[in-house]
Amino acid sequence: MDQNTLIKTAQQILDTTTELSKHLAESDIAIPNDLNVGTTSGLWTTHNAEIEALRLKITGLSQNLGMLLEGPHGFLHEYVSVNWEHGALYTLLDHNVLEQIPLDGSKIAIADLATRVGLPADKLLRICRLVATVGIIREDTEGEFSHTAISETLVKDQGYKSFIGFQTFETRVASAHLADSLRKPNPYWNEGQAAFELAWGMPMYDWHREHPEKGKRFAQAMQSVSKNLDAGNDMIIQWVKGSEGLQNGKPLHVVEIQGKTGAFSAELATLYPNAEFEVQDTSADLISRGKQTLDPELASRVKFSQRDLFAVRKCDEVSDFTDNTVVFLLRGVLWNHSDEEVITLLRSFLPAMEHGIKPIVLISDLVSPIWATFESHVERAFRRRDVTLTTMHNVKQRTSTEWSQLLQSADPNFKVCAFPVDLFGIFEN
């Protein structure tokens, strides 16, 4: 007789977990036994292909088992009800409640906690209890709360706290307006309107300028995401490490397009002391801030200039670098521009690329995978990003085919070389 699906799925979870534990032991990675304050594990931060694949498989199987156990009504009820947990968590973040809980793992009574943050104790108790039920904080003794490793992260990593705050405030409100944004013809790009704009009355970047406190939080959030969740920067670093120019001893001259304050170029300059960088941006304010915050030791190799994004790049812009490998770096620049704008921008490099030194245009941007590239529990993060870009900016995350078509439309002589990467580790959003 065939084994029932519940037992089969549970056995797959056990078998895969056993295999994962073996890999962790072979890699000398400690297995987390709990989520107490101070707990760390390489399991949470190691993203090699084998470990990540096993971890994701266990997660997917666990989700499947949960759906089988809950059934349609139970699953849907739980799926939508987490909205209330998100609202409760945002309240704790916005009122800095977690910062008032002792980081040494000891408890604090709700009355004391409420006094410290200036909130009514009876309301705060209910909010904390809901957050505790999902394991973010603990209530091991009635009315007394303590940290877990999860809430500890939200206190110690303010950038990540900003990311969670952004996700549980601006994006929640915007996503509630996605349906309304589609009640009339609403094409992508500049001709249409993002759900965020419908919800908040203006485009996201404008809204953050109008609300500088939220704008600062958003900037911190994006910096944290770039550092911790987005593999794009690491992919660029790996490309630079393996670049022909670097291997042959020919110094790199990297022009970072729309490089903002130059934080990433400064990071690259630290890693590669023989390379030099020019950070370009349309914003005089960002360029000024970049100059002010740059490490003085890097000042001779990291330069700044204000420049129009779409201005044509002539041969004389690279003629002084005949002994260098010149790279124009477009890091997350193209995703929010229409096809016409992307083509215009790519064509602006053509005169410079005709120079004998053969400059390179290095593009790191978002790609929407084709259907069924991954298992659904992995694909979910990519589809979430598809909808995120639609909701927040009314832009489309392009497929690899669409990117290739754009490059060919810009100039059929563009030779595209894709950098092979391990996709595991880029699924979080």
Swiss-Prot record:
The keyword Metal-binding does not apply. Disruption phenotype: Leads to decreased, but does not abolish, production of herqueinone. It catalyses: (2'R)-atrovenetin + S-adenosyl-L-methionine = deoxyherqueinone + S-adenosyl-L-homocysteine + H(+). One of its GO terms (biological process) is secondary metabolite biosynthetic process. One of its GO terms (molecular function) is O-methyltransferase activity. It comes from Penicillium herquei. O-methyltransferase; part of the gene cluster that mediates the biosynthesis of phenalenones such as herqueinone, compounds that have been reported to treat tumors, bacterial infections and/or mycoses, and rheumatic diseases. The non-reducing polyketide synthase phnA synthesizes the heptaketide backbone and cyclizes it into the angular, hemiketal-containing naphtho-gamma-pyrone prephenalenone. The product template (PT) domain of phnA catalyzes only the C4-C9 aldol condensation, which is unprecedented among known PT domains. Belongs to the class I-like SAM-binding methyltransferase superfamily. Cation-independent O-methyltransferase family. COMT subfamily. Its EC number is 2.1.1.-. It is an enzyme of class 2 (transferase). Pathway: Secondary metabolite biosynthesis. S-adenosyl-L-methionine binds at D285. This is O-methyltransferase phnC. Keywords: Methyltransferase, S-adenosyl-L-methionine, Transferase. InterPro entries: COMT-like, O_MeTrfase_dom, SAM-dependent_MTases_sf, WH-like_DNA-bd_sf, WH_DNA-bd_sf.
